[in-house]
Design a protein with these regions (language model features):
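S-adenosylmethionine/decaboxylated-SAM
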Residues: 11, 31-49, 68-210
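Rossmann-like AdoMet
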Residues: 1-71
Length: 210
């Protein structure tokens, strides 16, 4: 059973009302292009939503992914915005991995997207700007563009990555993350993408970078 199959099974148990008989057009495209990752029949059981990445925001999905973290290493989020997701992730981490001494690191320019993005909603350069850097316990925020902050970060933090949440939407930003962490993403690293598939331009952004 693939990881996606397991997620789908948990979704079914978590909320039966999501089950319907039709497939959204964007999800048909996913089935056609990456059959090795997704079983076509699975999409008959999913309720149409604006985009798949909304499902990943459900608490149950965060919990499922963190349950599968086995490495002792860095916990990272790329694309913090107002801090809602990293707050949830950190609370689950503390519950499921109480012995972990690692803090969460959040990366964001806090100046909005560096370029236009056509995702679940069309956003322009500068959109998704946060008024201020969030403040929360056991979390360190790194303000700036990924191409500047990640190289400096990896000079100081050389541990392998245990968990990486990529919520930066754009191909260019995702490439910055994956290239700079290439030596620290190892077998066993859990990577959660927020916008991997499920919207019209999915195959030219996070998916393409991965």
């Amino acid at each position: 059973m693939t990881l996606y199959d397991k997620l789908l099974k948990q979704q079914k148990e978590f909320d039966q009302k999501w089950l319907v008989s039709n497939i959204p057009r964007s999800q048909k495209k996913v089935c056609e292009k990456i059959p090795d990752l997704f079983e076509k029949k699975a999409f008959y059981k999913m309720k149409p939503r604006p985009c798949n990445h909304e499902l990943a925001r459900e608490y149950a999905y965060y919990e499922y992914c963190i349950k599968h973290v086995e490495l002792d290493g860095l916990w990272l989020e790329f694309g913090v915005y107002n801090g809602a997701s990293i707050k949830y992730l950190n609370s689950i981490k503390k519950k499921l991995k109480p012995d972990s001494k690692q803090v969460f690191h959040g990366f964001d320019s806090f100046e909005g997207l560096p370029e236009d993005w056509k995702g679940s909603v069309r956003t322009k350069k500068g959109d998704l700007k946060s008024i201020e850097v969030p403040s929360m316990p056991d979390t360190i925020f790194h303000k700036g563009w990924f191409k500047d902050t990640i190289p400096e970060f990896v000079k100081e933090y050389k541990d392998q990555c245990a968990f990486v949440h990529i919520d930066c939407d754009l191909y260019s930003s995702t490439v910055d993350v994956l290239e700079n962490l290439s030596s620290q993403i190892v077998p066993g690293t859990v990577i959660l993408f927020d916008e991997l598939t499920g919207y019209d331009a999915w195959d030219i952004h996070e998916y393409k970078a991965f």
